[in-house]
């Protein structure tokens, strides 16, 4: 499945289940957080965050994927903690996020930089799987692996990484 954001084709490649908790640990996601997943796919990241007590916002342009995310949240008993937004990630309002999760392409990350910098509050954490945000300094880098895959998480903090 594919979504188009601002005319850019972004394939849906789900984050491996065994990597999710490591991402949430890296950003210290918990109660009181509002986690936005930009291009949320089947909702697995916001669902895991909701199970930790965080509220989630699932931003997805593809209606089939958004429906699947809603169904998954209902079956996991956390739908009441997640807002589902069918929108382009470049247009969605993300200003109340305390954490943003992205598994996009580097080119898309770079196009999102102005939005992230202008809309997010100082201290907001950004987790990106496998693709850096060019020109920003990561606060932490975490290598993750499973028998089937190796990945890298980059953690950025608004007001620290984007200077």
Predicted segments — roles?
Residues 1-33:
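S-adenosyl-L-methionine
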Residues 77-89:
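Conserved SAM-binding strand-loop segment of SAM-dependent methyltransferases
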